[in-house]
Regions:
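ABC ATPase nucleotide-binding domains
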Residues: 74-238
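Conserved ABC transporter NBD signature motif
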Residues: 62-70
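The feature captures the beta-strand-to-loop junction immediately N-terminal to the Walker
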Residues: 39-41
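Non-catalytic connector elements of ABC transporters
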Residues: 254-445
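ABC ATPase nucleotide-binding domain
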Residues: 8, 29, 65, 424-426
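Conserved coupling/switch loops of ABC nucleotide-binding domains, chiefly the family-specific signature
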Residues: 60-63, 213, 432
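Helix-to-loop junction immediately C-terminal to a conserved catalytic motif
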Residues: 54
């Protein structure tokens, strides 16, 4: 096998004839021997990037570079990249041994040398006993190993893998992802791996590149991308269960900051280091991201941590822990959590609220007692310049307002809350992530 190489894309763009922008100016570098995953939902452009790198598609603009040198269009020998497809692409009329040997038949190796190479690779992947079978006689996991073996057989300079485990059952998938990652590292093979499965991406890769609508959102080590997401999409896409996304408005009285969630508040006291960057955003709408482990049940709400109050809506027992869904009455993001879309941009709180809050609105009443705030004279009918935030639900959410602002938390076994009972949740402010109306991270220090 020849020396492994680095792979890079330079402002790579692909526009299909119907006008679909599949890849939009993506620049990624994969170092020699590095394992990088391209992660994102269906249609984000990750498989198209892989095909562009392999030479199976021609870019509309931009370049693919191997060891820093641009490569010409087409999948010719100047690339020497082995690709493993989602459907394995094995020849059904050939035996396993013949499938593995196929790329060697195109090179200078003698039949004896090729057979020795096949035997060596089969032993490495534990498929020696399958060499005389045909693909139709193999399980999904066995076919995947054969596809990997064929990729290893030629003089490959890098592996390109397009969702290779998506057709494998869940029980075998965990085993195979460990095998694939270990094999790539043992061979010190440069690997570009496409997946929509965040578990695969986070457990296998040296670095993860998160894509959305053809654009690179963020790239970095898995732990860094998870802990320090740059955009709302990355924060929402990574993590199981999905992060809780709540709409809030910033109110900055003297000294401190209040995050107004519609029916509840998260208060940051004057001495909190997060206050200063938020005071400049008085009345702005933001999205609060709280992962499941940022919220924990507490029996006594009088502690130093801010709390959210709610009612248990459902309990999903997973054996070692439970996922508990709690209705808080707070405001979900305008476009809904399921779509992972960013909030609409460019508006301040005063432009987003109805003209009048309902009588007895708890946040308004509480704030009025805490911080007197005069009503402006003859405010415009479409603007609100006083504090307060009143829930306005998306059409998709109007049918179930009782579940608005539901959050999911992790609860250890064996003591679990019951459906319908009230619950108080402490908020870990160190895990609170805030994003502006364009979906960009607000740095809190």
């Amino acid at each position: 096998m020849v020396a492994v190489v680095s792979i890079a894309t330079d402002r790579l763009t692909k526009v299909f004839p119907d006008g679909t922008v599949a890849v939009d100016g993506v620049s990624i570098e994969v170092g020699s021997g590095e394992f990088v995953t391209l992660l994102g939902p269906t249609g984000c452009g990750k498989s198209t990037i892989l095909r562009l790198v392999a030479g199976l598609e021609e870019p509309t603009s931009g370049r693919v570079l191997i060891d820093g040198e641009p490569v010409r269009a087409g999948p010719g020998p100047n690339r020497q990249l082995s690709m493993v497809f989602q459907d394995y692409a094995l020849y059904p009329h050939l035996t396993v041994a013949e499938n593995i040997r196929f790329p060697l038949s195109l090179g200078p190796d003698s039949p004896a040398a090729a057979s020795a190479r096949v035997a060596e690779i089969a032993d490495q992947l534990g498929i020696t006993g399958l060499l005389d079978r045909r693909p139709g006689q193999l399980s999904g996991g066995q076919r995947q190993r054969v596809a990997m073996a064929r990729a290893m057989a030629g003089e490959s300079r890098a592996f390109l893998l397009d969702e290779p485990l998506s057709n494998v059952d869940a029980g075998l998938r965990a085993e195979l992802r460990t095998e694939v990652a270990a094999l790539a590292r043992r061979l010190e093979m440069t690997t570009l791996y496409v997946t929509h499965d965040q578990v695969e991406a986070m457990t296998m890769a040296d670095r993860v590149a998160v894509l959305r609508r053809g654009r690179l959102q963020q790239i970095g080590p898995p732990g860094e991308v998870y802990r320090d997401p740059r955009t709302l999409f990355v924060a929402a896409f990574l993590g199981t269960p999905r992060a809780n996304l709540l709409q809030a408005a910033i109110y900055a009285p003297d000294g401190g900051v209040l995050l107004d969630l519609g029916s509840q508040l998260i208060e940051l006291p004057p001495g909190d280091p997060r206050v200063r960057p938020l005071r400049e955003r008085h009345t702005e709408r933001v999205t609060c991201v709280l992962r499941a482990d940022a919220l924990s049940p507490v029996p006594d709400p009088s502690g130093p941590a801010p709390v959210l109050r709610g009612v248990v809506r459902s309990v999903e027992n997973l054996g070692h822990e439970a996922l508990v869904r709690v209705t808080t009455g707070t405001v979900p993001t305008p476009s809904g959590q399921a779509s992972l879309e960013q909030p609409t941009s460019g508006q301040h709180l005063s432009e987003l609220l109805a003209d009048d809050l309902p009588a007895g609105h708890p946040v308004r009443d509480r704030l009025a007692r805490m911080i007197p705030h005069p009503r402006p004279e003859q405010p415009p009918a479409t603007a609100r310049t006083e504090y307060g935030f009143y829930p306005v639900y998306d059409p998709e959410l109007r049918g179930e307002p009782a579940d608005a602002g539901a959050v999911v938390i992790r609860v250890p076994m064996p003591v679990l809350p019951r459906v319908g009972e009230p619950i108080t949740l402490a908020v870990d402010l160190d895990q609170l992530l805030l994003f502006d109306t364009s979906g960009d991270r607000i740095r809190l220090g």
